Amino acid sequence: METVKLTLGPILFHWEAEAKRDFYARIADESPVDTVYLGEVVCSKRTPFFDHHLPDVIERLARAGKTVVLSTLSEVVLPRERAMIRDLCEMPDCLVEINNAAGLLAAAGRPHRIGPMMNVYNEETMRQLAKRGADHFSLPPEMSGKTVAVMASSRVALDVGIEVQIFGRVPLAISARCFHARAHQRSKDECQFVCGEDPDGLALTTLGDEDMLTINGVQTLSYRYLNMAPEIAEMAALGVSHLRIMPHQTDMIAVTRAFADHLSGKSTAEDVTERLAGLKIGPFINGFWHAIAGHRYHQAP
């Protein structure tokens, strides 16, 4: 499985700028991931906080041998947001992951990546996007293993990369309305960035007081954490080329090393799960892959 590469997805949450800068410094110096995705993908209002750190972070990651990819917004409503995506896609010598169709025109004819928010669910969609320059697809996390197998079977013919999320809370939906602001009796325009008070998202509970989902500004995620360590060998056999780890408020160096050790054959999937549990991460889910309810965890008999 050594040909399969680890990637670190973009930070979905509103972390303080200095905390993000320091986080990426550690990733550059200590993490075994091959590729790092940067950029604000959830809320354009958060973008100015980190923009002035971005050139230095890109330079440091590149110096450490990481492939750096800039991810676009996934929710585009305003003209300035369309302009942000257009400007990003037109930057020379810059790898871009598109998470909204607003970026397709600007990126057409140039190599670019398609992010999980683009909802590429079948091989014909992948083929059409590849004709326009897409050379890498991060698949939606709710896809089953059987569907991923069909998508991955086209990878060689299309000469594209296939990426699947293997760790972290699962992005499920995004809205024009801000759930975080509403939860604090604020409007979206006057949110005062209250989402920053929950650096791993705000848990939503059922009427029975059971944890159900997580909100992150305008985004909805799973409450439980995806852990696909037991499925990695199957993914590699299917032709999945990249495995995505999503950043959270835990020791991400330990998380990425746990998966890297498994890819290199130094540990088992069970070892990975034990190491993650030791970091107080969980409970775990992997239901989507097995075509059952996504919030469930399927254990092989």
Each predicted region: which residue ranges?
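A cross-taxonomic marker for long C-terminal extensions/tails that follow the last structured domain
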Residues: R132-D135, P141
